[in-house]
Regions:
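RNA/tRNA-interacting regions in translation and RNA-turnover enzymes
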Residues: 1-252
Length: 252
């Protein structure tokens, strides 16, 4: 079966992989091609377009591997060995150091983590099995690798701004939903989520309604304040005049 091992959790705190079978690689529907074009992104095929669409819609870069090219049906997230080489999708070959993060199969590199996929594992017209990737890679490492190699992409630029581990799961669910909506594959139950849970928990914010009104300079009813925060997905607790709120992960 498919396995995922994260050997460098300090550079990849969360990695989600999901297997899709019976894949039919084809042109994306017109509505998706139009939306991508409006954002300056060329349509490639339905599978790759799903990953690009999600990056634009949610802000989470994704990648799709042709599963048949992954030795041992394995994903290993690890630091590169000194002078290890990878050829990326654009045909460029890079010599790496241990500062660079790789997505590998059981034997060889399959992608330069967060920057670009490897040439060997790209989605082709004949691809029938896909492994979707949604991950959080640390922005400092992506920036350092991108500058050192002189290689950047839409994905690396998004990662350099910082990605929340919460978004990683949302993006994968959205990708699988689009696979079903476009009818381009069968979503299996084979999904693996490696979460090192290194994200700091959101600290509760405690204050009073009186102080909120003093800062605002207007009077807002207690119930209205509570209602607004709850509609913004804050976890709110009220006790007499004091209010405690915990922000959702994406509002840290």
């Amino acid at each position: 079966g498919i396995s995922v091992t994260v050997k460098a959790p300090e550079l990849c705190p969360r990695y989600i992989a999901h297997y899709v079978k019976d894949v039919k690689v084809a042109e994306s529907p017109l509505w998706m091609r139009k939306r991508l074009a409006l954002c300056g992104v060329n349509s490639i095929n339905n599978i790759v377009d799903i990953t690009n669409f999600i990056r634009l819609e949610i802000g989470q870069p994704m990648h799709a591997f042709d599963l048949s090219t992954l030795e041992g049906e394995s994903i290993v997230v690890r630091r590169a060995e000194d002078k290890e080489k990878i050829t990326t999708l654009d045909g460029k070959e890079f010599s790496l150091t241990s500062d660079n993060l790789l997505i590998c199969d059981a034997k060889k590199p399959a992608a330069l983590a967060g920057i670009m996929g490897g040439l060997d594992s790209e989605i082709k017209d004949s691809t029938s099995e896909v492994l979707f990737e949604s991950a959080k890679f640390m922005k400092g490492n992506i920036r350092t690798t991108s500058r050192a190699l002189g290689q950047s992409s839409d994905s690396s630029r998004a990662y350099e701004k910082g990605i929340d581990t919460y978004t990683t799961g949302i993006a994968m669910n959205r990708a699988l939903h689009l696979v079903q909506e476009l009818g381009c594959g069968t979503v299996t139950k084979t999904g693996i989520d490696r979460d090192a849970k290194t994200e700091p928990e959101n600290k509760p914010i405690k204050t009073t309604f009186k102080k909120i009104n003093a800062v605002l300079g207007i009077t807002v009813q207690d119930d209205t304040i509570t209602d607004i925060l709850r509609r913004l997905n804050f976890d709110v607790t009220v006790e007499n005049d004091s209010i405690t709120a915990v922000a959702p992960p994406y509002r840290q």
